[in-house]
Amino acid sequence: RLTLAMATVASLCAVRRAARRKFGGASAKAFVLLSCVQFHHLFYAGRTLPNTFAGIVVACATAAWLDGQWRRAIGCLTAAIVIFRAELLLLLAPLCVLVLYHRHLTFFALAKLGIGVGAAALAATVAVDSYFWRRPLWPEAEVLYFNTLLNKSGEYGTSPFHWYFTSALPRALLAAYPLAAASLALVPKARPIVLANLFFVVV
């Protein structure tokens, strides 16, 4: 758990460095301060949960996104989708749209990258999880089957549509919540990544 917590901190440090390069030193310092006072993130930093592992990879993808390293950002998110959390496709989708719109990558290059990383991640997760569960297994495929095809996600419990905005995000983000909203109006360079994350939450 200590190693996992250190990996979480290292991924946040990568975001801090990228934020400094993108938005300046004051923004990087504010990110450190906000990260230190957010209880939920630090509480789960060393817990062996899929969301914790996915969070590390997504933080690395965020740092790459801020630095304009599009291949690395897309590769990280693709791996996280296949191995840890399939719903991260909703975060990858707007990134791919932006990359194609601004012609950072061609569609062929994007598809080649996604297929290559996805295949490698699939081989890794099937090999590891099949070994430990002693049967052929792709965990995220089973989750999708249960939640989507069988439509049984409601068995985990349901919440109103506004729950993320009125309960989960305020508790998780604290002061960063209103600041993220303000950045849409005040920081044009932040809009793409904020809107992409907003799309992820809404959908």
Per-region residue spans from a language model:
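Short acidic/glycine- and proline-prone juxtamembrane loop motifs at membrane-interface regions
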Residues: F43-F53
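Hydrophobic, aromatic-rich transmembrane alpha-helices
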Residues: S167-V201
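Short helix- or helix-capping micro-motifs
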Residues: A28-F39, A63, T78-V82
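Extracytoplasmic catalytic-loop and juxtamembrane helix elements of membrane-embedded
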Residues: T106-I115, A127-W163
